[in-house]
């Protein structure tokens, strides 16, 4: 478990924030929406160049916290998951010249 997951787990234990994985997934989706809203606002809905604000950074932090809480509820190590994803993308790029799936 990495530093971020450990900090999230400590906070959850301290304040009784444990919840089932589906609740954590829903929270993550909600936080992603809030980040998306900040990106839209920061670019005037795509009309202007994106300006990163303190609110953008706060929402990114909320997304990261929610992802760590979801991973903890699933007993998954985010760093291991990330390493597997990087390996998958490197292999795919080596085979196809792209990282996107062909499904």
Where are the regions that the model predicts?
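Flexible "arm" and connector segments at domain edges
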Residues: 1-60, 64-103
């Amino acid at each position: 478990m990495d530093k971020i997951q450990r900090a999230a787990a400590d906070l959850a234990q301290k304040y009784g924030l444990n919840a089932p994985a589906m609740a954590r997934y829903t929270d993550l989706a909600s936080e992603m929406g809030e980040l998306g809203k900040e990106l839209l606002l920061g670019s005037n809905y795509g009309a202007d160049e994106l300006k990163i604000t303190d609110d953008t950074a706060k929402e990114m932090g909320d997304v990261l916290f929610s992802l760590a809480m979801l991973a903890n509820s699933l007993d998954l190590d985010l760093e291991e998951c990330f390493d597997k994803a990087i390996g998958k993308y490197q292999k795919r790029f080596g085979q196809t010249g792209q990282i996107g799936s062909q499904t």
